[in-house]
Design a protein with these regions (language model features):
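Intrinsic, short, N-terminal disordered tails of RNA polymerase sigma-factor systems
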Residues: 1-19, 109, 131-133, 137, ...
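Basic, helix-initiating cap at the start of DNA-binding domains
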Residues: 1-39, 43-52, 69
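Alpha-helical structural segments
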Residues: 23-34, 38, 52, 69-91, ...
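Residue-level preference for short helical/loop micro-motifs built around acidic side chains
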Residues: 42-43, 68-69, 98, 119, ...
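Short hydrophobic/aromatic patch on the recognition helix
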Residues: 55-64
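Helical hydrophobic small-molecule/effector-binding pocket
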Residues: 88, 98-122, 131-141
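Amphipathic C-terminal alpha-helical segment
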Residues: 109-113, 149, 168-187, 199-210
Length: 212
């Protein structure tokens, strides 16, 4: 498997695969997601994916020659789905404040309902937190830079260093909430999450970008 930071970078920058044009590939990755959620990503094998997909062995191996290819493609696809959900949330708000709240609700909802993320959070939350604790912090940096770009897009006059610091705080908060869900706000209640974002995250972003 390629390093996670590299996969996330591909998810952000590379041209997406048209899944409508290759339904077989989609079926394979859907099976891989179900299998990884059931047994864990580390224990998943290509043979497991073949069995769960219901496709022929050679059909699967023609598209993914080895296990790492399946894992890499799955991670990139799910990251793209996450970014698309967040982008859709950002597009829902009529104001930067509404957009921030909608994006936070969308991100937390994705994490809450995603089968593989839920398995990791339930069985090994330390793996999620390790992305923030890793020495090179590449994954955290990518998340921070993505958030910073969204903040800067709605607040072009904001101080760049302040925006980066604010984005770093939000990225760390999100990882913590995914790994160790809070009691308040209730991560299962979109209304609570939206109120939390408006009451706390929006002022933090405004103050942190020098516009509060």
């Amino acid at each position: 498997m390629a390093e996670l930071a590299g996969l996330l970078a591909r998810a952000i920058t590379a041209e997406p695969v048209d899944e409508v044009e290759d339904p077989t590939r989609t079926r394979i990755l859907d099976a891989a997601l179900d299998e990884a959620a059931a047994v864990g990503l580390a224990r998943m094998t290509v043979e497991d994916v073949v069995r769960r997909s219901g496709l022929g062995r050679m059909t699967v191996y023609r598209r993914f020659a080895k296990r790492d290819d399946v894992v890499d493609a799955l991670v990139v696809r799910e990251c793209r789905r996450f970014l698309a959900v967040v982008a859709e949330g950002l597009g829902e708000g009529d104001t930067p404040e509404d957009a921030t709240a909608a994006a936070f609700v969308a991100a937390m909802g994705f994490a809450r309902t995603h089968p593989l993320l839920r398995r990791v959070a339930d069985t090994d939350p330390g793996a999620v937190l390790a992305t923030a604790a890793a020495r090179d912090r590449q994954v955290l940096t990518l998340g921070r830079d993505f958030i910073a770009a969204q903040i800067a897009g709605s607040r072009p006059e904001a101080d760049a260093r302040a925006v980066r610091r604010t984005a770093d705080l939000i990225a760390r908060l999100f990882l913590t909430y995914v790994a160790v869900p809070p009691d308040d706000p209730d991560p299962r209640d979109d209304a609570h999450l939206r109120a939390f974002a408006r009451d706390l995250l929006v002022p933090v972003i405004a103050a942190g970008s020098g516009l509060g």
